[in-house]
């Protein structure tokens, strides 16, 4: 049992420079998968004032106008005005793409198991790299996500909506939110202690108006009233001015918001980013599978909280380890859960791709506001269709 404590998570808007990069990388990935579902993609993006650089390794039968995809993505985010120091019509776009290394491809196309004579087609694809991936679920929200990251994402979605609908017409695309939640001694959320929200804005709006609008039109409609009280602290644009933002204010790079993308720091992270990678990259696909497993375990009420680790060797199909941790909240032994997971979930890369239908162009929509706990889009790793099977396996 813990004492009362505070825990904080953050989110960033789709106009944050790192998130611009993530969305461009995933928009390119989706465009390639739409033409060639077997595309091998490792697409990185960097953005700065007036410049986008797209680079990486891609092997595909598809043809995609990368410049067009980049510019369209930037404009959809809201960078449509040269005053922002970055806009989709006028920025330079440089492309430096190579093919996937044949040394890597030989281990992905023909796994160690296949080379040793295994005829199972799901054993053919080896992991695209070594690595460890985590998935997590907790019963403190309906989405089975930690509350601080859920609230942070919700604030960012709300402020983007108000900007795009011109309700607050002085808003610009870059923004960040951070929410601190107080937990009781049973590790259940009690209240929101602090909300930090910084939003880019036009130069002529006053700080007082921004603060009033953010509290009344962003925070209060988003965070349930029973979580806010007279002691809740609000820090709105605490530097006093946020006119220069986006890539003009900070360079952005694919894969630099891995905690925003996942659980807001409430769970461990293996270090691998998601965006711009096709599903043979287990950094992405195995993280989705681990979330799928953890969410189904918690949804089955086999634990209140669950973290799953999966690890791989490059070029080998079967994971080298699968670990289930329920933090003392499980109703069955963790070893029994791990056995059930191995039996019910095919964690070979080809098995994950088949189980979650990952060759589709579904990735750009995940590149802002988190890859997990989403209710606004249908993501297969958020389904709880393994609950009955897990319950039966753990009797």
Swiss-Prot record:
Report the principal subcellular site. Answer: cytoplasm
Q: What keyword terms does UniProt attach to this protein?
A: ATP-binding, Cytoplasm, Magnesium, Metal-binding, Nucleotide-binding, One-carbon metabolism, Potassium, Transferase
One GO CC term, this protein = cytoplasm
Assembly and partners? Homotetramer; dimer of dimers.
User: What does the entry list as the binding residues for K(+)?
Assistant: 44
Q: Name one GO biological process term.
A: S-adenosylmethionine biosynthetic process
Location of region: Flexible loop: 100-110
Q: Where would you find this protein in the cell?
A: Cytoplasm
Q: Which residues bind Mg(2+)?
A: 18
What this chain does, per the entry, is described as: Catalyzes the formation of S-adenosylmethionine (AdoMet) from methionine and ATP. The overall synthetic reaction is composed of two sequential steps, AdoMet formation and the subsequent tripolyphosphate hydrolysis which occurs prior to release of AdoMet from the enzyme.
Sequence similarity: Belongs to the AdoMet synthase family.
In Swiss-Prot or TrEMBL terms, this protein is called S-adenosylmethionine synthase
Q: Which GO terms describe its molecular function?
A: ATP binding; magnesium ion binding; methionine adenosyltransferase activity
Co-factor binding details: Binds 2 divalent ions per subunit.
* Positions bound to L-methionine: 57, 100, 250, 281
Show the catalytic activity: L-methionine + ATP + H2O = S-adenosyl-L-methionine + phosphate + diphosphate
Cofactor(s) listed: Mg(2+); K(+)
Name the pathway.
Amino-acid biosynthesis; S-adenosyl-L-methionine biosynthesis; S-adenosyl-L-methionine from L-methionine: step 1/1
Residue numbers binding ATP:
16, 174-176, 241-242, 250, 256-257, 273, 277
One Pfam family linked to the record: S-AdoMet_synt_M
Q: Does the keyword Magnesium apply?
A: yes
EC no. given is 2.5.1.6
């Amino acid at each position: 049992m813990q004492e009362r404590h505070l825990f904080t998570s953050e989110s960033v808007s789709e106009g944050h420079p790192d998130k611009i990069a993530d969305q461009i990388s995933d928009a390119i990935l989706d465009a390639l998968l739409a033409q060639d579902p077997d595309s091998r993609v490792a697409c990185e993006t960097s953005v700065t004032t007036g410049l986008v650089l797209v680079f990486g390794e891609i092997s595909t039968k598809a043809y995609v106008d990368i410049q067009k995809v980049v510019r369209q993505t930037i404009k959809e985010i809201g960078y449509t005005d040269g005053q922002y120091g970055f806009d989709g019509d006028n920025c330079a776009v440089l492309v430096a793409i190579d093919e996937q290394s044949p040394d890597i491809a030989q281990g992905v196309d023909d796994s160690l198991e296949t080379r040793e004579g295994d005829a199972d087609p799901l054993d053919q694809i080896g992991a695209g790299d070594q690595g460890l991936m985590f998935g997590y679920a907790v019963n403190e929200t309906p989405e089975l996500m930690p509350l601080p990251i859920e609230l942070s994402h919700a604030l960012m979605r709300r402020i983007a909506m108000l900007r795009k609908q011109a309700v607050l017409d002085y808003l610009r695309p870059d923004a960040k939110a951070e929410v601190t939640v107080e937990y009781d001694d049973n590790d259940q959320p009690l209240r929101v202690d602090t909300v930090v929200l910084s939003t880019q804005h036009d130069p002529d709006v006053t700080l007082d108006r921004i603060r009033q609008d953010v509290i009344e039109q962003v925070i209060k409609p988003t965070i349930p009233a029973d979580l806010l009280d007279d002691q809740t602290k609000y820090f709105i644009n605490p530097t006093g001015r946020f006119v220069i933002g986006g890539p003009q204010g900070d360079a952005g790079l694919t894969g630099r918001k891995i905690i925003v993308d996942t659980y807001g720091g409430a769970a461990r992270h293996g270090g691998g980013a998601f965006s711009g990678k096709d599903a043979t990259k287990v950094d992405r696909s195995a993280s989705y599978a681990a979330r799928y497993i953890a969410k189904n375990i918690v949804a089955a009420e086999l634990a209140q909280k669950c973290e799953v680790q999966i690890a791989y060797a490059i070029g080998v199909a079967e994971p080298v380890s699968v670990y289930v941790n329920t933090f003392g909240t499980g109703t069955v032994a963790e070893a029994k859960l791990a056995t059930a997971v191995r039996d019910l979930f095919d964690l070979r890369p080809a098995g994950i791709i088949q189980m979650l239908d990952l060759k589709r162009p579904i990735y750009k929509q995940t590149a802002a506001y988190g890859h997990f706990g989403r209710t606004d889009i249908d993501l297969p790793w958020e389904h709880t269709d393994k609950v009955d099977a897990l319950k039966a396996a753990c009797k």
